């Protein structure tokens, strides 16, 4: 899990990492969409929940506060931001396991299965093929009836949202990986990974473009890892 692989650091550049939380607060209206994402699923005591690409752990901590009895794990390949995540969880007295590494077969085999997989602001940063890989891994990692919950940039409808997205997110993270999100690829990729139903539950206009909330379910008795 700690083998070196490429990943996009917070805000796209390592030099910007110290300003990540301030930028997210200022440009994404996280005070609006994060609570809505958490309310999509209130985990029960004892269930296992993973936050994929947890970063500094803002969503991870919110999940634990919402469901103190749940077993919450955050995974991220960036050790620098995980240091902040661990320190903040300790300061709040929250028992959260943070793992440095990738959400891959090795992680799921040793940490899963999960009742819920959460992810926020990750998919727009990764190539199209990796978006699909992460979603297939999420499907395999979930127990039957488990749910995937995602907050990320979705369709940028209208000139204003396109303009804002182009001049913030795409200036920082580039066009190649982000444009697929802006054209609405995530629901299709979720269905291709096996999720059904797939719902777009909300869309929040922000200074950096529209952020969409998704909820998708793993039905039946499909394979878990």
Where are these regions (language model features)?
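A short SAM/SAH-binding and catalytic strip from SAM-dependent methyltransferases
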Residues: 116-129
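Short glycine-centered segments of the SAM/dcSAM-binding site in methyltransferase folds
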Residues: 48, 145-147
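Class I SAM-dependent methyltransferase SAM/SAH-binding core
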Residues: 50, 56-105
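C-terminal lobe and adjacent flexible extensions of AdoMet/dcAdoMet transferase-like proteins
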Residues: 213-225
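A short acidic, Gly/Pro-enriched loop at the edge of an enzyme's catalytic core
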Residues: 108-117
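Conserved class I S-adenosyl-L-methionine
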Residues: 1-43, 58
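A short glycine-rich, Lys/Arg-flanked "PGG" loop and its adjoining helix->strand segment in the class I
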Residues: 132-144
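C-terminal alpha-helical "lid/dimerization" subdomain adjacent to the S-adenosyl-L-methionine
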Residues: 4-7, 151-193, 198-212
């Amino acid at each position: 899990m700690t083998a070196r692989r490429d990943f996009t650091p917070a805000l796209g550049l390592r030099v910007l990492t110290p300003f990540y939380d301030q930028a997210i607060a200022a440009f994404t209206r996280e005070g609006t969409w994060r609570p809505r994402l958490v309310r999509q699923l209130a985990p029960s005591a004892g269930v296992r929940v993973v936050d994929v690409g947890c970063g500094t752990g803002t969503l991870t901590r919110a999940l634990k506060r919402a469901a103190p009895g749940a077993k919450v794990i955050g995974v991220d390949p960036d050790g620098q931001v995980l240091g902040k995540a661990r320190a903040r969880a300790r300061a709040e007295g929250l028992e959260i396991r943070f793992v440095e590494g990738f959400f891959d077969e090795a992680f799921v085999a040793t940490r899963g299965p999960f009742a819920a997989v959460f992810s926020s602001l990750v998919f727009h940063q990764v190539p199209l093929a990796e978006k699909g890989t992460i979603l297939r891994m999420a499907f395999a990692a979930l127990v039957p009836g488990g749910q995937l919950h995602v907050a990320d940039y979705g369709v940028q409808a209208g000139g204003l949202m396109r303009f804002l997205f182009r001049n913030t997110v795409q200036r920082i993270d580039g066009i190649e990986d982000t444009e697929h999100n802006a054209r609405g690829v995530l629901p299709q990729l979720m269905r291709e990974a096996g999720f059904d139903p797939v719902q777009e539950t909300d869309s929040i206009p922000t200074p950096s473009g529209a952020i969409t909330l998704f909820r998708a379910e793993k039905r039946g008795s499909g394979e878990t890892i």
